[in-house]
From Swiss-Prot:
Entry keyword set: Glycoprotein, Glycosyltransferase, Golgi apparatus, Lipid biosynthesis, Lipid metabolism, Membrane, Signal-anchor, Transferase, Transmembrane, Transmembrane helix
GO molecular function: galactosyltransferase activity; lactosylceramide 4-alpha-galactosyltransferase activity; toxic substance binding
Record's bilayer topology term: Single-pass type II membrane protein
Entry function: Catalyzes the transfer of galactose from UDP-alpha-D-galactose to lactosylceramide/beta-D-galactosyl-(1->4)-beta-D-glucosyl-(1<->1)-ceramide(d18:1(4E)) to produce globotriaosylceramide/globoside Gb3Cer (d18:1(4E)). Also able to transfer galactose to galactosylceramide/beta-D-Gal-(1<->1')-Cer. Globoside Gb3Cer is a glycosphingolipid of the globo serie, one of the major types of neutral root structures of glycosphingolipids, that constitute a significant portion of mammalian cell membranes.
Protein name per the record: Lactosylceramide 4-alpha-galactosyltransferase
Signal peptide feature range: none
Cell location: Golgi apparatus membrane
Motif (DXD motif): 199-201
Catalytic activity: a beta-D-Gal-(1->4)-beta-D-Glc-(1<->1)-Cer(d18:1(4E)) + UDP-alpha-D-galactose = a globoside Gb3Cer (d18:1(4E)) + UDP + H(+); a beta-D-Gal-(1<->1')-ceramide + UDP-alpha-D-galactose = alpha-D-Gal-(1->4)-beta-D-Gal-(1<->1')-Cer + UDP + H(+)
Documented EC number(s): 2.4.1.228
GO biological process, one term: globoside biosynthetic process
Glycosylated sites: 210, 316
Length: 360
């Protein structure tokens, strides 16, 4: 998908054929051209340095030393009967869920024992006999209402305006293509099937089935699509898909995600600011405490000790907790500590928490 690291390095090592032509012209034009070339070169070098030095997150690298099987606990779940699914997506080729990923799915499965929790992973082949064996897939398979399935993006985007966009996106390089793919996938998924979508860095505290045609406010200026709950073929999602393609810009972080949802909601409600309205025409934007009780700027609070009383007060009006994995990944967590995140693991995903205490 896109341009590989080796392709990018090879491209950068060759001077462009058009460079001599670009350097013709007045001295001012040459200075401007050299500035643009230098800026782009610096940007690409910085990304290559990031690839070489950072690599996979620490917790992801640690996963490969874990056992591949997990003894399933005794679970007394009722038969799945509730309509609608709860979806999780992995749009990269990773097939080895992190502990936070496992906790997200487990907490959703426990909070919705009568609902189907569907985990779609792009890296899984259709042939289940060729699936990798790892702790994450083994643990999540313990839950009778969890289904793990391969994700075919071309099939998902079929018969939507996203199909042509995705075809082109596979042949160009962009810095934020993976998160952009995730942004596109979630709105296409809910538009086609309806249900609830959650990012894999959520911990679900309460049943979400009574939430329909809703999303969450991240701050007073912006919405967030880490949680979405919509009916199938809802016009708001159709508008999001059209806006995604019509105003596409993959070079600005969040332009196809939170910013897209924010501008579409403003258009939907005919408002200029989120302060003017939080519900209109059947779509509701829930307050930050519902899904984002701790702002991303304060993500370290998840790793600080809290008392049970403070925890209860903090999450009194919260349905699910977004952990801001983009910021927190790789941060050490002592599973048996009184840290806020450790307490959430112990209470809402006890099977994952037990695995953490055994293997971390």
């Amino acid at each position: 998908m896109g341009i590989s690291r080796s392709d990018l390095e090879e491209t950068m090592s060759k001077p462009p054929d058009c460079l001599p032509r670009m350097l013709r012209g007045t001295p001012r034009q040459r200075v401007f051209t050299l500035f643009i070339i230098s800026f782009k070169f610096t940007f690409l070098v910085s990304i290559l340095i990031y690839w070489h030095t950072v690599g996979a997150p620490k917790d992801q690298r640690r996963q490969y030393s874990l056992p591949v099987d997990f003894p399933c606990p005794q679970l007394a779940f009722p038969r799945v009967s509730a309509p609608g699914n709860i979806f999780f997506l992995e749009t990269s080729d990773r097939t080895n869920p992190s502990f936070l990923f496992m906790c997200s799915v487990e907490s959703a499965a426990r909070a919705h024992p009568e609902s189907q929790v569907v985990v779609l992973m792009k890296g899984l082949p259709r042939d289940t006999t060729a699936w990798p064996r790892n702790l994450g897939i083994s643990l999540l398979s313990c839950f009778p209402n969890v289904q793990i399935r391969p994700l075919d993006l071309q099939e998902l985007f079929e018969d939507t305006p996203l199909a042509a966009w995705y075809l082109e996106a596979q042949h160009r390089w962009e810095p934020y293509l993976l998160p952009v793919l995730s942004d596109a996938s979630r709105i296409a998924l809910l538009w086609k099937f309806g249900g609830i979508y959650l990012d894999t860095d959520f911990i679900v505290l309460k049943n979400l089935r009574n939430l329909t045609n809703m999303l969450g406010i991240q701050s007073r200026y912006v919405l967030n699509g880490a949680f979405l709950a919509f009916e199938r073929k809802h016009e708001f999602l159709a508008l999001c898909i059209r806006d995604f393609v019509a105003h596409y810009n993959g070079w600005i972080w969040g332009h196809q995600g939170p910013q897209l949802l924010t501008r579409v909601f403003k258009k939907w409600c005919s408002i200029h600011s989120l302060k003017e309205s939080r519900a209109c025409r059947g779509v509701t934007a829930l307050p930050p405490e519902a899904f984002y009780p701790i702002p991303w700027q304060n993500w370290k609070k998840y790793f600080e000790d809290v008392s049970p009383e403070e925890l209860a007060q903090l999450l009194n009006a919260t349905y699910a907790v977004h952990v801001w994995n983009k910021k927190s990944q790789g941060t050490h967590l002592e599973a048996t500590s009184r840290a806020l995140l450790a307490q959430l693991h112990a209470r809402y995903c006890p099977t994952t928490h037990r695995a953490m205490t055994m293997y971390l």
